């Protein structure tokens, strides 16, 4: 956390080259993405066979998908990251808020986020 604050202060100060600033922004984005993944894992938990049609860390099976309800943590992690990246891309037009909206959509569903008052 202290590192992110330091990086943010350096960005604001303008004392870094554009290339360095771009690298810092990428690092901060990765850190936020990892934090979102950790939060989803903590609050969703790893779903087992009794949670059908949900597998992994809350992935809802779509028609034609053949994911096992007994997937490993590594497989579940990869599926979560893939889903979250797709949702981030869906909300890309919202800039810095795309990860926040993607995390919310992962939890409540994309349709509910799009119909929500927060999107007005």
Give names to the regions the model predicted:
Residues 3-120:
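Cell-wall polysaccharide-cleaving catalytic domain and substrate-binding groove, primarily
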């Amino acid at each position: 956390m202290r590192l992110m604050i330091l990086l943010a202060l350096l960005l604001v100060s303008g004392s870094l080259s554009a290339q360095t600033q771009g690298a810092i922004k990428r690092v901060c984005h990765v850190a936020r993405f990892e934090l979102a993944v950790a939060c989803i894992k903590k609050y969703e938990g790893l779903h087992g066979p009794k949670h059908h049609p949900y597998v992994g860390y809350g992935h809802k099976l779509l028609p034609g998908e053949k994911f096992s309800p007994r997937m490993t943590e590594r497989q579940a992690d990869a599926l979560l990251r893939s889903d979250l990246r797709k949702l981030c891309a869906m909300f890309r037009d919202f800039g810095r808020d795309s990860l926040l909206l993607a995390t919310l959509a992962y939890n409540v569903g994309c349709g509910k986020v799009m119909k929500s008052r927060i999107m007005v």
